[in-house]
């Protein structure tokens, strides 16, 4: 994409910034270098001020509240979009406000700085601001996956504050549900205070509610996860019919299933997403969810290419085609709720995008799409599938084969730099951990403090410069001066 090299270089610079004063400019040592067409003010950085905002994104005209941990006398803040300064003001104390401009779908960067006696500007801290009335225009997706007794209100507030600092504007709730065919813990009329998820972990309904409420207070949206075609082994007792399943053969005797450990509740048996009765059934179960939990939409999942599968009558099932009618049925039942559907290894991607009913595109990439060149291929295809209107989020599980310890920081940052520069974003940040597995509660790898700091800077860059990275533009061929003999892997 145009500017990819410059965008990646800028992100690497952000990650390498330190608290040491690193003078740039030089020259006459006065209030700025003169000569040529413009005056240039020398600038240096001393990133010692930590900044936060009260929300992950704002509507045009909304009040943005900033907080700083400490400010020196004479500090000022400057607001700019790309290279255009919008306004600036003096700041004192630890908090101040700014009215978001009227222009919608725009990224801004706030620089807090002071001016030295020689005229050099010292940047003390920076933070991005996203002014967008619809979060799906520039989705920055995170997740939560644990809802046990440890998730107190204060703990949830702390976790969501970090996601807010990274401008995460949508959060996927993974492994929150009771059963795939009956997601709500309890009934519409009577919720269970505690229930078991598929792995027999405790799920506290109040924790789920608290996550949603606190996310909304930060301006985030909450999306519940579920398969489009999953049922547990007790589904018949909950009204799921045998005729709704898909089978490995034409004789409707061997149900297709996703096998799970014996210690878990059940294997997951697969239904026909295109079956109208199943669609009506699960849409009603979703209605029970929406009636009790203030979710903003449904993150639909699938399991990729299953090979030849058959319905109860022995007809071959075209799964990508059934995804279309499933999405349309879900939107028809809840037109005001958002929908996103996973394209596992791009399976069904064109059909999903072609519905016109999903709000952005979501690709879970696996070994057959593990090169950086594959990310470009996916984004280019999605751009066509979505009529140049839908953004792409990648679910790419980092350091997948590493058993314990910390994430490989250079690998994380390189992957993010490539994804962001291409115009995508990366589902990787959770409330309490970074994602390393398709089983989202897996916490075997930890983020170092250095990685946490770098990630904040990367997400500031993606947000502040979203109009450069993710808002159209033309593709331009770039000649690389570096030859890589082997593909670069995620």
Language-model segments: what does each one mean?
Residues 274-360, 366-378:
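Active-site neighborhood of glycoside hydrolase catalytic domains
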